């Protein structure tokens, strides 16, 4: 089984964690922006169906 030989430094660990959090923040902002534009009816980036079949 592969085992790292030395500990990862705090700065490297913090940098990786910050990058991971930044990616999540960007994805959340993008989805929120898309949802807002859908509610306002100003979407131009994709096609979606307005009508929902109620059963």
Swiss-Prot record:
Q: Which interval of the chain is the signal sequence?
A: none
Localisation per UniProt entry:
Plastid, Chloroplast
Pfam families reported in the protein's UniProt record: Ribosomal_L32p
Q: Which GO terms describe its biological process?
A: translation
| Residue numbers spanned by region Disordered | 1-24
Q: Is Protease tagged as a keyword?
A: no
Q: Which UniProt keywords apply?
A: Chloroplast, Plastid, Ribonucleoprotein, Ribosomal protein
Q: Name one GO cellular component term.
A: chloroplast
- Main location class: plastid
Note whether Phosphoprotein occurs among the keywords: no
GO molecular function (one): structural constituent of ribosome
Q: Which HAMAP family match?
A: Ribosomal_bL32
The UniProt entry's sequence similarity note says:
Belongs to the bacterial ribosomal protein bL32 family.
Name of the protein described by the UniProt record: Large ribosomal subunit protein bL32c
Organism whose genome encodes this protein: Phaeodactylum tricornutum (strain CCAP 1055/1)
